[in-house]
Swiss-Prot record:
This is NAD(P)H-quinone oxidoreductase subunit I, chloroplastic. The lineage of its organism: Eukaryota, Viridiplantae, Streptophyta, Embryophyta, Tracheophyta. PROSITE patterns: 4FE4S_FER_1, 4FE4S_FER_2. Its main location: plastid. NDH is composed of at least 16 different subunits, 5 of which are encoded in the nucleus. NDH shuttles electrons from NAD(P)H:plastoquinone, via FMN and iron-sulfur (Fe-S) centers, to quinones in the photosynthetic chain and possibly in a chloroplast respiratory chain. The immediate electron acceptor for the enzyme in this species is believed to be plastoquinone. Couples the redox reaction to proton translocation, and thus conserves the redox energy in a proton gradient. It comes from Piper cenocladum. It catalyses: a plastoquinone + NADH + (n+1) H(+)(in) = a plastoquinol + NAD(+) + n H(+)(out); a plastoquinone + NADPH + (n+1) H(+)(in) = a plastoquinol + NADP(+) + n H(+)(out). [4Fe-4S] cluster 1 binds at residues 64, 67, 70, 114. One of its GO terms (biological process) is photosynthesis, light reaction. GO terms for molecular function: 4 iron, 4 sulfur cluster binding; iron ion binding; NADH dehydrogenase (ubiquinone) activity; quinone binding. One of its GO terms (cellular component) is chloroplast thylakoid membrane. Belongs to the complex I 23 kDa subunit family.
Amino acid sequence: MFPMITGFMNYGQQTVRAARYIGQSFAITLSHTNRLPVTIQYPYEKSITSERFRGRIHFEFDKCIACEVCVRVCPIDLPVVDWKLETDIRKKRLLNYSIDFGICIFCGNCVEYCPTNCLSMTEEYELSTYDRHELNYNQIALGRLPISVIEDYTIQTNNYELNSYKKMTDKPLDSEKITN
């Protein structure tokens, strides 16, 4: 008879212990309901980047002296610098500069070691595309600073030239006007 009573007592103790654990976990859950959310709603809210954030590289074509220091310090030899030696003035003339951001590891060595400070890191971090070849930026694309990280409703594109071109191409060609 005693083993049966001790079994009931053990069962009762285990039940009380389980109820206490459930109560503690419920109290923790309730304490989290008063907190503000940690995550942000990404497409609608953008996270504020830090001052030392290493985003897309900005390139200033006029400052570059084609010394290729950026290529030498890059761990993956990524920047492509095309230049031509001007024999009459004995200086290099930069022809083309490009970086493939699909391969870039954003280490910032090229920016740090550039002697003319023609490279800088921007706060732009949205570089995703459906085609990886679109991530190969030339000097024109690298020279553009982002207007805004988000689409601003105050900035509107001028589609006047595009619409007038479409109107011209929609008309069928008249062979008499072309020959006369």
